[in-house]
Structure formats: structure tokens, C-alpha cells
Amino acid sequence: IIFGILLPSNKEGAAEGARQLSFTPDTLQNLFVIGAIFMGGLWFFSLLGEERRSTGAAAQAAENERTSSIWGDLKLVWSNRQTRLFFWFLALSMMFAFAQDPILEPFAGQVFAMDAAHTTRFAAYWGSTAILSTILFIWLGRRYPSLTNTRLSNVGVAMLALTFAIFGLSGLAQIRGLVTIGLVFLGVGLGIWNVGTLGMMMEMSPSRRAGTFLGFWTLVVTIFRGLGTSGAGIALDVLKSLTGGNLPLAYGSIFVACGVGLVVSLWALRQVNVKVFQSEQGIVEADTASVLAAGMD
């Protein structure tokens, strides 16, 4: 995740940035190899002190295991109103928040004539801010119980919507100084949203069906982030054609549309009630167990 945030968003930018910093291909290749080895070492280090699996718990889990189809699992997730609302929040926020990936650097380069040596650092700027914001709000969330995952998600998405409004105004009014402000807001908003949303994904996954629910949420994140990234690039090409090559209008319109999409996702989030969902799970799981038992009979 860290490498994905910090690396440039396009190959041309990466190559140009390397040229500007006088990196040779061999040096750059060595950097990637060393980075991969370092991250692999951290992964092995994270396993130290890992609790051993309890054989008694494993035997009990195997005894209670019931088979079900993937469609049955999806119906289980979709059958609850709270999970449907959370799905729309997760899908829309993921799609529109990362729509900036393929267009933010070209936006600065084409609208404000920034060179690649500067634009390729954008991901490092907002990515580093996002990491620091994530660490800070994890600590604050543990220290202050009032900072619930739902509240953090609300604040994070609201900041992201404001970020895209800033980028939209920057493009439409051609105010270069707003780009820097937008990068800071983007990093802080992503960090807060990351903490709150990951926490909500776990809260919206009942313990007995954690694999099913977490797998579904992860699938939603992957698919809709891809749709947002590809969709933004397609929309940019279409708007360039429709506006006769008016770059400020094309980029500004996409940023504004993303901001509106994030506001809609915020509305969906406001309808989600984690406590109601968790209180319903006893009934839902009992019904599911009876259906599965009848099927086995």
C-alpha cells in the first residue's frame, strides 16, 4: 500500500523524474530490488511473536463448518439494508476518491505548465501526508472513544469532497496556488478516511461470517478503485473532445463531478447504523443457520 501511494502514477512521469534526478536505469533497478527486500524483511519481522493456532479452536471450527455457495454468501451480504448502504458508501467513495490517480499530474502539467520533475512528486506529497494522518488518527481514535470509525469516515469523506472542490476551482479559475492546498487536503482526508473505513469494514463483518463479509468488502474496494481510475481517464478524453480541447474546463468538470460523487457517498454513509446492524446479526445468523440446516437435511 505504501509503495502504491508513493510511486508516480504514470510510467512517463517516473521516467522523466528519474532523468531529472540523474538516476541511471541500473540505479533505479537496484532501488526497487532493495526496496522489495526491505519490505519482505518487514513482513517476516511482523510474524515474530505471532500466537500459535489453538488446535482446540481449529477442531471446533472444523466441526461447525458448513458449506455454502458464493451466491448464497453474496445474498447473505445483500439481504441486510445496512450492508447495502455501506456497500454504496464504500463503492462510491473508493471510485471517486481515486479518480484523481490518472489525471492529477497531467492536470498540473497541461493547465499550469508544471514540469514533470514537480508533478511526479505529487504522489509523494499527498501519500506521505496520508500516512502521517493515518498514524495520527489511529492514535487519536484509541485515546478518544468519541472518535468512532463512523465519525472518522464522515470527516474523511467530507475533506475529500472539499479537496475535489478545491481542485475544481483551481482548474476552472486557473488558480495555481490552490493545487498545493488541494494536495495537503487530499493527504489528510485520505488518512482519516482510511482509518475510519477500514474500521467500519470490520464492524460490518460479523464474527461468524467474517471471511465472507471482509472478502466482499475487499472485492468492492478493488473493483471500484479500478473503475474510478479508468473512468476518469475515459471521461477526460470525452470532455476534451466535447469542449474543443478546453483543458481547464475538462479537468475542472471532472474534479467537480468527483466532489459531487463523494457527497452522495457521504449521504449513504449517514444512513448506515453500525449498532443496528450488529444488533440484527443474532437474528440474521439464526435464520441463516436454520436455512443451512434444512438444506443439509
Stretches found by the model and what they are:
Residues 192-206:
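Intracellular juxtamembrane helix-capping segments at the cytosolic ends
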Residues 1-99, 114, 259-297:
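Intracellular loop-helix junctions on the cytosolic face of multi-pass helical membrane proteins
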Residues 158-174:
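C-terminal ends and interior cores of transmembrane alpha-helices
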Residues 176-194:
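Hydrophobic core of transmembrane alpha-helices in multi-pass small-molecule transporters
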Residues 121-130, 221:
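Transmembrane alpha-helical segments of major facilitator superfamily
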Residues 7, 133-150, 236:
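Helix-to-loop junctions at the C-terminal end of transmembrane segments
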Residues 1, 116-117, 205-220:
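Loop-to-transmembrane helix entry/capping segments in MFS-fold secondary transporters
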Residues 102-119:
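Short amphipathic helix-loop junctions that connect adjacent transmembrane helices
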